[in-house]
């Protein structure tokens, strides 16, 4: 049963943070935002903000050390970090509605490495996808599905 939602909050959209806190409050789940700086959230429901130091991966390492299989869910965009968590048995989703599995992580890492090679060779430019209502709805549905699946 999911008791805690941990959010790798540095790059998590405000709309996702607000929804996560509101959704968790209805389900009696505790939310932790972890980042290397204070992160805004406009929800009136309670949440915990953990500010780590500014070392590379300090927020990821904090989340990894404090999560457990069976009681925790993590929201992150970081595929390498998701791989560490999934190996530990912790369910992981991103803010675009993907539930990470070993297979999906392997596929995404391969895509990322290929795209990075194209950029390094000058054959492509870095691409940063926008965040729209459709992606948010996929996230909200995925969050609900994973929570219900882990009741």
Q: Where are the predicted features?
A:
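Nuclease catalytic cores that cleave nucleic-acid phosphodiester bonds
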Residues: 2-151
């Amino acid at each position: 049963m999911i008791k805690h939602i941990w959010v790798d909050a540095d790059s998590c959209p405000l709309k996702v943070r607000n929804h996560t806190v509101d959704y968790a409050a209805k389900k009696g789940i505790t939310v932790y935002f972890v980042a290397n700086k204070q992160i805004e959230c406009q929800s009136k429901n309670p949440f915990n903000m953990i500010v780590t130091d500014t070392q590379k991966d300090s927020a990821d390492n904090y989340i990894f050390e404090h999560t457990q299989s069976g009681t925790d869910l993590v929201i992150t965009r970081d595929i390498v970090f998701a791989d560490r968590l999934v190996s530990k048995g912790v369910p992981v989703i991103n803010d675009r509605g993907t539930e990470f599995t070993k297979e999906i992580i392997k596929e995404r890492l391969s895509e990322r490495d290929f795209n990075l090679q194209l950029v390094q060779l000058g054959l492509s430019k870095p691409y940063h996808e926008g965040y729209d209502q459709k992606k948010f709805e996929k996230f909200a549905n995925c969050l609900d599905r994973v929570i219900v699946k882990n009741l």
